[in-house]
């Protein structure tokens, strides 16, 4: 059956305000540029720019900011037929504080936000059956009714042979406590095909299913989660990232660059990797090299969604490999070998 969409995403949409008078405290910043934000929104835009057909389950405010989001999505050729407007809730606002090349913080306003108002009635099987891959962003599990909507989408996809990607995307705001986080993350992770998360996010996801998870290393987590998923990526900031399958382990370094800000690379990383995973799953080494290259490009950019075209990323990756042929290394690995 021919699929209309390559990817459908469900998750966070926000409005970002990034200072143009950066390397300054927020209290001293007076000039800001407005962008669409939120991990799921950024990844959707990245995937669409890579010539994928993209859909989205979401909820936005019924106001000027909601209209801004829908206009951006339409301009980026993302289907908005399953994005509803809510009159009683506002989109979350994110103000970024770019203190230096290395240090950035965020100030968020996420009380009763619009993106968490997607409901089980907004999720329909017909739309899910039209995609090859469903991408779930973990922030959408933070509160009801969004978390129930996500779980419905998850199980509809799983029961109908649609691949599920879980991008953990942990943000402490909106959650009541860590037990709640770990519980819902574990449910989704154990029913996914692919997990992407930082070491800290994987640790948080594993609190109820592994003993003393704080004492475990990447390999330990991979051995456990590969009982459920086909592939797991564990990111470790400046130390790079690792990709695991049952019989494959790849270790990727970062590409050193002069940073403008200390955030924004993760969404570009996910966009490039998922694009390559769908189109050329047999060559994951190249996919990981593209992903880590895209992340390095994005930390030089003022926004978190302004992904350059594929040719520029490819050229950046090729130059990085010339400088360091061991940018991505294959390691001996078998997850279930005694």
Swiss-Prot record:
Pathway annotation from the record: Polyol metabolism; myo-inositol degradation into acetyl-CoA; acetyl-CoA from myo-inositol: step 5/7
Q: Does the keyword Chaperone apply?
A: no
Q: Which organism is it from?
A: Mesomycoplasma hyopneumoniae (strain J / ATCC 25934 / NCTC 10110) (Mycoplasma hyopneumoniae)
- Per the UniProt record, one Pfam family is PfkB
Q: Does the keyword Nucleotide-binding apply?
A: yes
Which family does this protein fall into? Belongs to the carbohydrate kinase PfkB family.
Enzyme nomenclature, EC number: 2.7.1.92
The molecule here is called: 5-dehydro-2-deoxygluconokinase
- What this chain does, per the record? Catalyzes the phosphorylation of 5-dehydro-2-deoxy-D-gluconate (2-deoxy-5-keto-D-gluconate or DKG) to 6-phospho-5-dehydro-2-deoxy-D-gluconate (DKGP).
The record ties this protein, via HAMAP family, to: IolC (MF_01668)
Q: Which controlled-vocabulary keywords does the entry list?
A: ATP-binding, Kinase, Nucleotide-binding, Transferase
